[in-house]
Amino acid sequence: MKINSKDDIIDYFKDGFKEKLFIGVENEKFLIDNSSGKRINYKQTLDVLNFLKTFGWTEVKEKENLIGLSHNGKSITLEPGNQIELAGGLCKNIHEVCLESYNFQDQLNEACEKYNFKTISIGHDPSTKTNDVPSNPKERYKIMTSEMPKNGSLSLNMMYQT
């Protein structure tokens, strides 16, 4: 494209506009067992995921292992230390983002109440040592656990505690 005038510059940017823009948000929660004060293990995470299926979520499996859920363009995934992450759908505005987040939190709260767990929304788990974080059977996390330390001494901390 040749730019010969101010209008050419304006047209260049106008041509890049998209008609429909969306917002997509991810949020992650640590789940804590109220009885022990520790992060929940994979078996306990399965209880939560199976409970969430009552809200219309469908299973996502890797081999025979339940590793997440999906529903209407949204997904719930298990992170390396059994953190639960909602990858939201395409939202038109911040109000839809809030509604989606609140609905998910309400569902998660119901599951946690049933199993005596609580959610914590913080960026880093300050009370669990990396070696004590429970794991799950996702294949890529096994590979990442062995490979990531080659690139930094805190890589497993980032993976399991954030």
Located regions from the model:
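Terminal catalytic/cofactor-binding subdomain
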Residues: 1-152, 161
